[in-house]
């Protein structure tokens, strides 16, 4: 035992994530270690508005032979290489396995068929405009497109032959996150199942409501607004925080201040405020290391089709998972203990938030050069 005061910026500790019912090991003293590992190559930013070789630019021919229209705003089309499809047979368990009474195999090797649709969402026609470089009005068009997809697919789920359950909207930005095309775009996968990560969050939010008669993320918003130290962006409708339980170095969580279950409930005010928050956050990200900041980002919201509990306990939020740790060339790797034990981070959430708080969210570094 020691009487020395516990310093969260110096000593190892675990932080609980109520959304996933799991812990993150925080080792802040490791941020001082020298780095001799792999470094990312800094690629030159695209400076052209139009690239004749890009499959996503207006008027170009895609790999499958389809021609893009000369679109002037956000453009959506079915993914030419979808991860899930509608035109496949239903999965049926092999009758011979059932009659053989092979209970061990059926117990261990569980399989479900998955049907769905995948879409590509080109944020804007300009090849060189990522979210922080787009106007707030242009980002608002992206938000409106997300909402239109959600509402349309929810209606199709209720009226069509396939009961779609979830629409996962996301963006992989930068080659460090496996993005295969530099033209600013996101994706939307619509499935007839609820994905595992989302299902886990929904389960824990439902358990929290049953135990406390209040919403998990609603309570979390109140707590973060009271403490302030992890908030990096805030407006009338949303806050963006480095979550207390963050894994990635500069991970953020965007949360609706009020109980908005999905994009379907967004009025013009919420669309404008979301666009503003996204522009400010991504501008801060780029300004952190004066680079086009890579990340994986995704929306979590109410299912297209679910139980009353699942829908009512949902709370609109967005996750941003950026890999960069110390500079534009050094990123975090989830390996070793993190794959075999539990996730681990070096700097604390509060240290990361302080870095982001001091950055300009209005002026992009490219406009200051």
Curated annotation (Swiss-Prot):
Pathway: Carbohydrate metabolism; galactose metabolism. It holds the Pfam family GalP_UDP_tr_C. SUPFAM superfamilies: HIT-like. UDP-alpha-D-glucose binds at residues 63, 79-80, 172, 187, 332-335, 337-338. Its EC number is 2.7.7.12. Homodimer. This is Galactose-1-phosphate uridylyltransferase. It comes from Schizosaccharomyces pombe (strain 972 / ATCC 24843) (Fission yeast).
